Amino acid sequence: MQFKIDTSEKFHAIKIKEPVLSANMTAELDACLMPLLQQDVKNVVLNLQDIQTIDNAAGEHLVKLQHSYYEQSASFVLCCVQKQVEKALDAADLLELLNIAPTESEAWDIVHMEEIERELGDSF
């Protein structure tokens, strides 16, 4: 699986450069994403702009990844999801379980807001 990672002060922006995200790619996705939870910068914005097709197992795996990130007090936001991928996730009843932003910029905003929420939550 081909992807590009850009790291900023608060998050990793990862763009998957494949037309299909399927179950047989989830191990590679884990190998890329799970080690990031051990770094100082843990938050991830996953850009799915190039993904044209996703199968149910891959969609379910994204939900599990997101859950793993939130359990570790880290953000996991999908962005730039194509309409056909959105429809596939919705048909599998997964769309509402995922944190999705229309653009990468809006995903960054979500990460920043969640960081503020975590900081405020820690202060009480």
For each predicted feature, which ranges?
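General small-molecule cofactor/ligand-binding pocket signal
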Residues: D6, C79, A101
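Structural signal for conserved beta-strand scaffold positions within catalytic alpha/beta enzyme cores
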Residues: K15, I100-P102
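STAS-typified acidic loop motif
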Residues: Q2-A31
